[in-house]
């Protein structure tokens, strides 16, 4: 387009140049740059002008900018001296304002000053400035001796800038287990080829999955910590990998990870996690008219009495507390079964809350709940929750372990636990990802209350790209990726529970009728 238009370009594509900071609000400095492309653009008055796509050396390509010809200088010795002159001025100006260093870094300036020849004097710069120096500001013409000190002080910030650039350019990889890769392929096939949808709300929603994982993680961490020598407590934390830090620290990191997944999922689902065929379903299930929230008739202080008294099936803790509890074979309920027993459908978020209450009630010997819970557990719960029940030491300082499953081995295993560690485990088992009063009754629930493992797994395909736009230190990123890996292994281990084929139904059955709204929390 350049030659045919008759436009004469001063610079050509691929040429190394110096370019002024394009943002007029930033300090006027010159960057090392390269011209990527040239076009004929237009100025504010509509006149044709040459424009150059500039890549700033050492920066991610997302920072490439279009610049007018008057912002670009040839890479000559004379212009290099101008570059150093402007860099010292910018540093001195920032110092004179008294700003904190962390808030006044000048990207690219430190590297310019770092390569300053020692024999080069300020007066040489003054005499050799080209006419283009007239464009710079008139302020701070006299550079004080402090600027030399400032150069040495600011140079040490260059590694931080370099680290930030490396973070922008690094590739983040999350390894997805083969069984979950196949699930992603099947998911795509069901939605796009067979035109089926995941029935919503899911039997096991994302809140429940994440809370279950924290409990699973805490129990495994406690077991592994109990097997280590006691003197591991004296090891310096700074020299320990994330695998070897104390169990309570691991659990805290795990909680932060799942909460971050919840927030990220709620935000990104409508943006990047839905196939086009699912958009209409999303709009319908997130409508405020679609779900009818249940109002609890008693406060948490009276909840024990409420549970011991007759109550509707949906609120009665003696009934199975999750949709997973319905099928006796451990498999998810079929759509036909859901229609036959609509009252049993409820959020596992709510069931987790009730389950914790049942555990607290069971500590009283007068309560009939433990026996009933014991009878119902082994035959009706999916193997994931049976697995947690068998490994879970739910007891307090003043009571003996509750026999959630008829196993003498469990008591023997937990007999060696210290009281402090047992209390930590019990604290995790009663932990909730979100408060009881969230979301408010007058608002539709967020996606993490409605969707399940199928859509959560899709998030891990997008996470590398999302994490690449975030600022993480190498140490924190490594720990986060390790937690993601452990969580994906958890999903893979229980994929039969989390990804039942029966979750995909015809579009007409993909959500419950608005004439009979379902409660999901």
Curated annotation (Swiss-Prot):
Keyword list, A-Z: Chromatin regulator, DNA-binding, Nucleus, Phosphoprotein, Transcription, Transcription regulation
Compositionally biased spans, kind Basic and acidic residues: 150-166
GO molecular function, a single term: histone H4K16ac reader activity
Main localization, broad class: nucleus
Any single biological process term in GO: regulation of DNA-templated transcription
MRG domain residues: 168-517
Domain Tudor-knot span(s) in chain numbering: 13-71
Region entry Disordered, spans: 114-166, 298-380, 390-409
Pfam family, one: MSL3_chromo-like
Ranges where the record places region Required for the histone acetyltransferase activity of the MSL complex: 290-440
PANTHER family: MORTALITY FACTOR 4-LIKE PROTEIN, MSL COMPLEX SUBUNIT 3
Self-association and partners: Component of the MSL histone acetyltransferase complex at least composed of the KAT8/MOF, MSL1/hampin, MSL2 and MSL3. Interacts (via the MRG domain) with MSL1 and KAT8/MOF.
Protein's name according to its UniProt entry: MSL complex subunit 3
Organism whose genome encodes this protein: Pongo abelii
Source taxonomy: Eukaryota, Metazoa, Chordata, Craniata, Vertebrata
């Amino acid at each position: 387009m350049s030659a045919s238009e008759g436009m004469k370009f001063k610079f050509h594509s691929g040429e190394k140049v110096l370019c002024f900071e394009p943002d007029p609000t930033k300090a006027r400095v010159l960057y090392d740059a390269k011209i990527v492309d040239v076009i004929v653009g237009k100025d504010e008055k509509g006149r044709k002008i040459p424009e150059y796509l500039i890549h700033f050396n050492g920066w991610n390509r997302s920072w490439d900018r279009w610049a007018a010809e008057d912002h670009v200088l040839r890479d000559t010795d004379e212009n290099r001296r101008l570059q150093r002159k402007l860099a010292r001025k910018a540093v001195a100006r920032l110092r004179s304002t008294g700003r904190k260093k962390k808030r006044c870094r000048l990207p690219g300036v430190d590297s310019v000053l770092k390569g300053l020849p020692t024999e080069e004097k300020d007066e040489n710069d003054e005499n050799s400035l080209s006419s283009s120096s007239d464009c710079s500001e008139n302020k701070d013409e006299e550079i004080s001796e402090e600027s030399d000190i400032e150069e040495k002080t600011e140079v040490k910030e260059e590694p931080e800038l370099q680290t930030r650039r490396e973070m922008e350019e690094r590739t983040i990889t999350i390894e997805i287990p083969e069984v979950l890769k196949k699930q992603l392929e099947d998911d795509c096939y069901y939605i796009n080829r067979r035109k089926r949808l995941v029935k919503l709300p899911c039997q096991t929603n994302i809140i429940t999955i994440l809370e279950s994982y924290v409990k699973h993680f805490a129990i495994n961490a406690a077991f592994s910590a109990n097997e280590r020598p006691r003197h591991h407590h004296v090891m310096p934390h700074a020299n320990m990998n994330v695998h070897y830090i104390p169990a309570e620290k691991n659990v805290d990191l795990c909680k932060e990870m799942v909460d971050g997944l919840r927030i990220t999922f709620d935000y990104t689902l409508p943006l990047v996690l839905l196939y086009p065929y699912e958009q209409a379903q999303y709009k319908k299930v997130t409508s405020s008219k679609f779900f009818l929230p249940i109002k609890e008739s008693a406060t948490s202080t009276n909840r024990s009495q409420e549970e011991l008294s007759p109550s509707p099936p949906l609120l009665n803790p003696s009934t199975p507390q999750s949709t997973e509890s319905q099928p006796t074979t451990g498999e998810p309920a079929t759509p036909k079964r859901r229609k036959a027993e609509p009252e049993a459908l409820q959020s596992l978020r709510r069931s987790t809350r009730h389950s914790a209450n049942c555990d607290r009630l069971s500590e009283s010997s007068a309560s009939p709940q433990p026996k009933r819970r014991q009878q119902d557990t082994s035959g009706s719960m999916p193997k994931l929750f049976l697995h947690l029940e068998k490994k879970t030491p739910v007891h307090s300082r003043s009571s003996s372990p509750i026999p959630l499953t008829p196993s003498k081995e469990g008591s023997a295993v937990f007999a060696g636990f210290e009281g402090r560690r047992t209390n930590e485990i019990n604290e995790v088992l009663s932990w909730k990802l979100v408060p009881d009063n969230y979301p408010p009754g007058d608002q539709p629930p967020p996606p993490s209350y409605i969707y399940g493992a199928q859509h959560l797994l899709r998030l891990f395909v997008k996470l590398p790209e999302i994490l690449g736009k975030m600022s993480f230190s190498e140490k924190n990123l490594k720990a986060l990726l390790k937690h993601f890996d452990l969580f994906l292994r958890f999903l893979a281990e229980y994929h039969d529970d989390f990804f039942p084929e029966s979750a995909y139904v015809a579009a007409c059955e993909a959500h419950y009728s608005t004439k009979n709204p379902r409660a999901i929390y």
